A protein has these predicted regions:
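Short, cysteine-centered beta-strand-loop-beta hairpins and adjacent loop/turn segments enriched
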Residues: 56-60, 84-91
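A solvent-exposed, acidic/Ser-Thr-rich amphipathic alpha-helical stretch
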Residues: 2-6, 20-74
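A short hydrophobic beta-strand element
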Residues: 73-82
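Short, surface-exposed coil-to-beta transition loops
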Residues: 62-65, 79, 92-98
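Short beta-strand segments enriched in hydrophobic/aromatic residues
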Residues: 27, 82-84, 98, 114
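Low-complexity, intrinsically disordered terminal/linker segments enriched in charged
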Residues: 111-127
Length: 127
């Protein structure tokens, strides 16, 4: 079960948009990560590579944890809101729940639940 301090450090890393670093620091070596009902990705190195690939296409990113965080033993649920402004001038706004299984101070399994329609980038509104 993660300590409250560990959860706060994890959330702070994600909110600082250090997504790849958060995976390196807070996931087990053989962690699984799954998007809705898709096939899970396995392995911390694969997750880090995926995060870096996504972030290489981002102009700006806002990551926000919406509290409260739900903790029940080794199970944690975090509500996130992300806003991606892509290099191609489009924007993606996503809200998701991350359902996590922690082994001590690291995440061993994580499933993201969200409406897949949110992943479709939209043209940035001129202001």
């Amino acid at each position: 079960m993660p300590t409250a301090e560990t959860l706060e450090r994890f959330i702070a890393r994600v909110e600082a948009n250090a997504h790849a670093e958060a995976v390196e620091e807070f996931y087990t070596e053989d962690a699984s990560m799954q998007e809705n009902q898709s096939t899970p990705r396995i392995g911390r190195d694969a997750h880090v590579a995926n995060e870096r690939t996504v972030l290489s296409k981002v102009k700006t990113l806002t990551s926000q944890c919406i509290r409260p965080i739900f903790v029940s033993g080794d199970r944690v649920v975090v509500r996130w809101i992300f806003r991606f402004e892509w290099l191609n001038g489009t924007v993606t706004h996503m809200e998701e729940l991350a359902y996590q299984l922690w082994e001590g101070e690291r995440i061993a399994e994580e499933t993201f639940f969200y409406d897949p329609a949110q992943r479709v980038p939209k043209k940035l509104d001129p202001q």
